[in-house]
Every structure is written in C-alpha cells, then in structure tokens.
C-alpha cells in the first residue's frame, strides 16, 4: 500500500492506494495547488515509511502596488 500526504497552510489530506494511484494523486494535488496559488508539500511513501516522491511548492507572494 502506498500513501499520499498533502499539507497546505489550511488543511492536511491523506489518501492511500497502489503506487500508481498514489503517484497520480500526488500529481493532481500539486497541479491543483499551483493553479490555485496555494503553497503545499506532497509526499508519496510506502507502508515502511520509505519516501518515493516528495515535492514542495511555494506560491509566489503578491506584491501590493505602490501609489
């Protein structure tokens, strides 16, 4: 069994599946975070805690325009 863990500033999502399913969830959640401008960390690991994939995305900070 493989696990996908997604952490954002406001929530934690935990899902489990086959390796292919967990990797697909990883890619879909990272794409969603990037499209929404949400910082997140995604990890895919197995039953023994071995990490197969880990990635962090930091959303760009909005800069207020000076007047």
Label for each model-derived stretch:
Residues 3, 25, 44-45:
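Intrinsically disordered, low-complexity peptide-like regions
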């Amino acid at each position: 069994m493989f696990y996908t863990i997604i952490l954002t500033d406001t929530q934690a999502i935990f899902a489990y599946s086959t390796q292919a399913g967990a990797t697909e969830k990883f890619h879909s959640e990272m794409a969603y975070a990037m499209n929404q401008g949400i910082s997140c960390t995604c990890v895919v690991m197995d039953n023994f805690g071995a990490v197969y994939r880990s990635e962090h995305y930091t959303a760009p900070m909005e800069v207020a325009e000076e007047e």
